[in-house]
Protein backbone atom coordinates (compact mmCIF):
# COMPACT_ATOMS: atom_id res chain seq x y z
CA UNK A 1 0.00 0.00 0.00
CA UNK A 2 1.37 3.41 -0.96
CA UNK A 3 2.08 5.68 2.04
CA UNK A 4 1.20 9.35 1.45
CA UNK A 5 3.64 12.10 2.49
CA UNK A 6 3.06 13.53 5.94
CA UNK A 7 3.91 13.28 9.62
CA UNK A 8 2.88 9.62 9.76
CA UNK A 9 5.35 8.61 7.09
CA UNK A 10 7.94 6.44 8.90
CA UNK A 11 10.44 6.10 6.05
CA UNK A 12 10.73 9.34 4.01
CA UNK A 13 12.97 7.66 1.40
CA UNK A 14 10.45 4.96 0.53
CA UNK A 15 6.87 4.85 -0.63
CA UNK A 16 5.98 1.52 0.98
CA UNK A 17 5.60 0.35 4.55
CA UNK A 18 8.32 -2.04 5.85
CA UNK A 19 7.72 -5.75 5.27
CA UNK A 20 7.90 -7.76 8.53
CA UNK A 21 10.53 -10.54 8.46
CA UNK A 22 9.41 -14.11 8.96
CA UNK A 23 10.64 -15.79 12.19
CA UNK A 24 12.04 -18.75 10.23
CA UNK A 25 14.05 -16.37 8.07
CA UNK A 26 15.56 -14.74 11.16
CA UNK A 27 16.34 -18.13 12.70
CA UNK A 28 18.15 -19.22 9.53
CA UNK A 29 20.17 -16.03 9.58
CA UNK A 30 21.22 -16.70 13.16
CA UNK A 31 22.34 -20.22 12.24
CA UNK A 32 24.76 -18.81 9.70
CA UNK A 33 26.32 -16.33 12.10
CA UNK A 34 29.66 -17.39 13.64
CA UNK A 35 29.35 -18.81 17.13
CA UNK A 36 30.97 -16.74 19.82
CA UNK A 37 34.61 -17.70 20.39
CA UNK A 38 34.00 -18.06 24.12
CA UNK A 39 31.27 -20.63 23.46
CA UNK A 40 33.60 -22.53 21.12
CA UNK A 41 36.34 -22.43 23.75
CA UNK A 42 33.96 -23.97 26.30
CA UNK A 43 33.02 -26.72 23.84
CA UNK A 44 36.69 -27.59 23.26
CA UNK A 45 37.16 -27.77 27.04
CA UNK A 46 34.14 -30.07 27.35
CA UNK A 47 35.57 -32.31 24.64
CA UNK A 48 38.82 -32.59 26.60
CA UNK A 49 40.91 -31.09 23.79
CA UNK A 50 44.52 -30.22 24.62
CA UNK A 51 44.85 -26.44 24.92
CA UNK A 52 48.03 -26.38 22.82
CA UNK A 53 45.94 -26.73 19.64
CA UNK A 54 43.41 -23.98 20.48
CA UNK A 55 45.41 -21.17 18.88
CA UNK A 56 45.73 -22.95 15.54
CA UNK A 57 42.06 -23.92 15.49
CA UNK A 58 40.86 -20.38 16.15
CA UNK A 59 43.46 -18.58 14.02
CA UNK A 60 42.50 -20.68 10.98
CA UNK A 61 38.76 -20.61 11.80
CA UNK A 62 38.66 -24.40 11.85
CA UNK A 63 35.98 -24.83 14.50
CA UNK A 64 33.07 -24.93 11.97
CA UNK A 65 34.80 -27.66 9.93
CA UNK A 66 35.67 -29.62 13.07
CA UNK A 67 32.07 -29.59 14.33
CA UNK A 68 30.91 -30.59 10.84
CA UNK A 69 33.21 -33.64 10.90
CA UNK A 70 32.10 -34.53 14.43
CA UNK A 71 28.36 -34.08 13.80
CA UNK A 72 28.01 -35.44 10.26
CA UNK A 73 30.64 -38.18 10.20
CA UNK A 74 30.74 -39.12 13.88
CA UNK A 75 34.48 -38.83 14.44
CA UNK A 76 35.74 -38.43 18.00
CA UNK A 77 36.04 -34.63 18.57
CA UNK A 78 39.24 -34.92 20.61
CA UNK A 79 40.87 -36.87 17.78
CA UNK A 80 39.69 -34.43 15.09
CA UNK A 81 41.04 -31.41 17.00
CA UNK A 82 44.40 -33.11 17.57
CA UNK A 83 44.51 -34.07 13.88
CA UNK A 84 44.06 -30.45 12.80
CA UNK A 85 46.26 -29.01 15.54
CA UNK A 86 49.20 -31.34 14.90
CA UNK A 87 49.04 -33.30 11.63
CA UNK A 88 47.38 -30.68 9.43
CA UNK A 89 49.40 -27.84 10.93
CA UNK A 90 52.65 -29.71 10.26
CA UNK A 91 51.70 -30.78 6.72
CA UNK A 92 50.50 -27.33 5.65
CA UNK A 93 53.74 -25.85 6.98
CA UNK A 94 56.02 -28.36 5.25
CA UNK A 95 54.38 -29.11 1.90
CA UNK A 96 53.70 -26.58 -0.84
CA UNK A 97 50.79 -26.83 -3.25
CA UNK A 98 49.86 -24.78 -6.34
CA UNK A 99 47.18 -22.98 -4.34
CA UNK A 100 46.23 -22.18 -0.76
CA UNK A 101 45.06 -25.33 0.98
CA UNK A 102 41.30 -25.60 1.38
CA UNK A 103 40.62 -27.07 4.83
CA UNK A 104 37.17 -28.18 3.64
CA UNK A 105 38.96 -31.05 1.86
CA UNK A 106 39.67 -32.59 5.27
CA UNK A 107 35.93 -32.99 5.81
CA UNK A 108 35.61 -34.65 2.40
CA UNK A 109 38.61 -36.87 3.19
CA UNK A 110 37.14 -38.15 6.47
CA UNK A 111 33.78 -38.70 4.75
CA UNK A 112 35.49 -40.70 1.99
CA UNK A 113 37.52 -42.84 4.39
CA UNK A 114 34.44 -43.72 6.43
CA UNK A 115 32.47 -44.65 3.29
CA UNK A 116 35.28 -47.03 2.27
CA UNK A 117 35.70 -48.60 5.70
CA UNK A 118 39.24 -47.21 5.99
CA UNK A 119 40.45 -46.11 9.43
CA UNK A 120 41.12 -42.41 9.89
CA UNK A 121 44.77 -43.02 10.78
CA UNK A 122 45.50 -43.22 7.05
CA UNK A 123 44.45 -39.57 6.66
CA UNK A 124 47.80 -38.43 8.08
CA UNK A 125 49.71 -40.28 5.35
CA UNK A 126 47.44 -38.82 2.67
CA UNK A 127 47.95 -35.19 3.70
CA UNK A 128 51.12 -34.45 1.65
CA UNK A 129 49.47 -35.53 -1.62
CA UNK A 130 46.28 -33.76 -0.62
CA UNK A 131 48.19 -30.49 -0.28
CA UNK A 132 50.59 -30.80 -3.21
CA UNK A 133 47.99 -32.14 -5.65
CA UNK A 134 44.64 -30.58 -4.68
CA UNK A 135 42.96 -31.75 -7.90
CA UNK A 136 43.86 -35.41 -7.33
CA UNK A 137 40.93 -37.55 -6.16
CA UNK A 138 41.22 -39.69 -3.04
CA UNK A 139 41.23 -42.99 -4.95
CA UNK A 140 44.23 -41.84 -6.99
CA UNK A 141 46.05 -40.75 -3.84
CA UNK A 142 45.59 -44.22 -2.34
CA UNK A 143 46.85 -45.80 -5.57
CA UNK A 144 49.96 -43.59 -5.54
CA UNK A 145 50.59 -44.72 -1.94
CA UNK A 146 50.22 -48.40 -2.92
CA UNK A 147 47.51 -48.80 -0.28
CA UNK A 148 45.89 -52.23 -0.16
CA UNK A 149 42.88 -53.40 1.80
CA UNK A 150 43.47 -56.17 4.34
CA UNK A 151 40.97 -57.71 6.71
CA UNK A 152 41.71 -57.93 10.42
CA UNK A 153 41.92 -61.71 10.05
CA UNK A 154 44.54 -61.43 7.30
CA UNK A 155 46.69 -59.09 9.38
CA UNK A 156 46.47 -61.19 12.55
CA UNK A 157 47.32 -64.34 10.57
CA UNK A 158 50.87 -62.99 10.21
CA UNK A 159 51.44 -62.93 13.99
CA UNK A 160 52.62 -66.55 14.52
CA UNK A 161 55.36 -66.31 11.87
CA UNK A 162 56.51 -62.88 13.10
CA UNK A 163 56.63 -64.04 16.72
CA UNK A 164 58.62 -67.11 15.67
CA UNK A 165 61.03 -65.00 13.65
CA UNK A 166 61.60 -62.61 16.55
CA UNK A 167 62.27 -65.48 18.96
CA UNK A 168 64.92 -67.17 16.80
CA UNK A 169 68.26 -67.49 18.58
CA UNK A 170 67.02 -65.78 21.75
CA UNK A 171 67.14 -67.50 25.13
CA UNK A 172 65.39 -64.66 26.94
CA UNK A 173 62.55 -62.88 25.16
CA UNK A 174 61.42 -59.43 26.22
CA UNK A 175 57.69 -59.18 25.62
CA UNK A 176 57.89 -55.39 25.24
CA UNK A 177 60.64 -55.64 22.61
CA UNK A 178 58.77 -58.43 20.83
CA UNK A 179 55.58 -56.39 20.74
CA UNK A 180 57.34 -53.27 19.46
CA UNK A 181 59.14 -55.26 16.77
CA UNK A 182 55.97 -57.00 15.57
CA UNK A 183 54.01 -53.73 15.57
CA UNK A 184 56.77 -52.19 13.46
CA UNK A 185 56.52 -55.01 10.93
CA UNK A 186 52.73 -54.80 10.70
CA UNK A 187 52.35 -51.03 10.82
CA UNK A 188 52.42 -50.38 7.07
CA UNK A 189 49.69 -52.87 6.22
CA UNK A 190 47.70 -52.12 9.39
CA UNK A 191 47.27 -48.36 8.92
CA UNK A 192 43.93 -47.76 7.27
CA UNK A 193 42.78 -51.34 7.83
CA UNK A 194 42.74 -51.69 11.61
CA UNK A 195 43.10 -49.25 14.49
CA UNK A 196 46.67 -49.49 15.77
CA UNK A 197 45.41 -49.48 19.37
CA UNK A 198 43.25 -52.52 18.58
CA UNK A 199 46.15 -54.27 16.86
CA UNK A 200 48.39 -53.59 19.84
CA UNK A 201 45.96 -55.45 22.10
CA UNK A 202 46.10 -58.49 19.81
CA UNK A 203 49.91 -58.48 19.57
PLM regions: where:
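Charged, compositionally biased, marginally structured helical/coil segments
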Residues: 1-203
Amino acid sequence: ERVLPGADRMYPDTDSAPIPLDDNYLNNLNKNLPTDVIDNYKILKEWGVNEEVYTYIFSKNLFPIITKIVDKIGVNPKYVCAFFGHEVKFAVGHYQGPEQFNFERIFKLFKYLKSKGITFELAEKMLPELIMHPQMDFESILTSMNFKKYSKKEILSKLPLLNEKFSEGKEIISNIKRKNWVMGKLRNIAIGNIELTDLSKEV
